[in-house]
Regions:
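Conserved pre-ATP/AMP-binding loop-to-beta segment of ANL
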Residues: 2-18, 25, 48-54
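Conserved AMP-binding A3 loop
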Residues: 14-38
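Short beta-strand->loop structural element characteristic of the AMP-binding/adenylate-forming
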Residues: 27-30, 57-58, 80-86, 154
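Conserved AMP-binding/adenylation subdomain of ANL enzymes
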Residues: 37-54, 62-102, 117
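AMP-binding/adenylate-forming core of the ANL superfamily
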Residues: 204-212
Length: 212
């Protein structure tokens, strides 16, 4: 029913997502239609996602990880989403093979739990090519990709608690990523001194942009 979208614009509120409460009680962060759609379009573009992709989600959709970094991508790509109530290390790869999953999401130590499962002849018998998430330890990153044949692992940094999200889209292990689409954004990373808790500045007082 098109009338349900009457008056909806890019800055309209899509939903409220609560922060983790790192600096106090959880706070409601407003997610706009434009931000949600923009994230999906961005991921769709640089990952080459399309209607043939199948997305595997075991994380809660009320959390920014699944909502922003998986569901928006699937909608933008026109793909299908396979939902599980919870993560299961023993069932993960069976689901991936059974449903032809091509994109999956992880959080925290999920990849370590998968890596700690006994090796099987079917470890590479799947269509999964991309895993997105945060928290994959550099100590197992390369071994995890090699064992399961995952072509690309993308870590994201910055959910509801940061103004600029960064992504490691280069398969560079341990990198905190970079600002995506730099040529289309006015966001820049500048040098900061953690010891003095202050920005590092040029003699004229301007901020110093970080280099490669």
């Amino acid at each position: 029913d098109p009338s349900r979208r009457d008056g909806v614009i890019g800055q309209s509120t899509l939903c409220l997502v609560f922060t983790s409460g790192t600096t106090g009680l959880p706070k409601a962060a407003r997610i706009t239609q434009a931000r949600w759609l923009g994230v999906g379009e961005g991921w769709r573009g640089f990952l080459g996602l399309g209607p043939d992709d199948a997305f595997y989600c075991v994380l809660p959709l009320y959390h920014v990880a699944a909502l922003m970094s998986l569901l928006s991508n699937a909608v933008a790509a026109g793909g299908r989403v396979i939902l599980r109530r919870r993560f299961s290390a023993s069932r993960f790869w069976r689901d991936v093979r059974e449903h032809g999953i091509t994109v999956a999401q992880y959080s925290g130590e999920m990849c370590r739990y998968l890596f700690n499962q006994p090796p099987t002849p079917d470890d590479r018998n799947h269509k999964l090519r991309v895993m997105t998430g945060s928290g994959l330890s550099p100590s197992i990153w390369q071994a995890f990709q090699d064992r399961f044949g995952i072509a690309q692992v993308i870590e994201g940094y910055g959910g509801t608690e940061i103004n600029v999200g960064m992504m490691n889209i280069d398969n560079r292990i341990g990198s905190c990523g970079r600002i995506p689409f730099r040529d289309r954004s006015n966001a820049r990373l500048v040098k900061y001194d953690r010891e003095t808790d202050s920005y590092i500045r040029n003699p004229d007082g301007t901020l110093i942009e970080c280099g490669p």
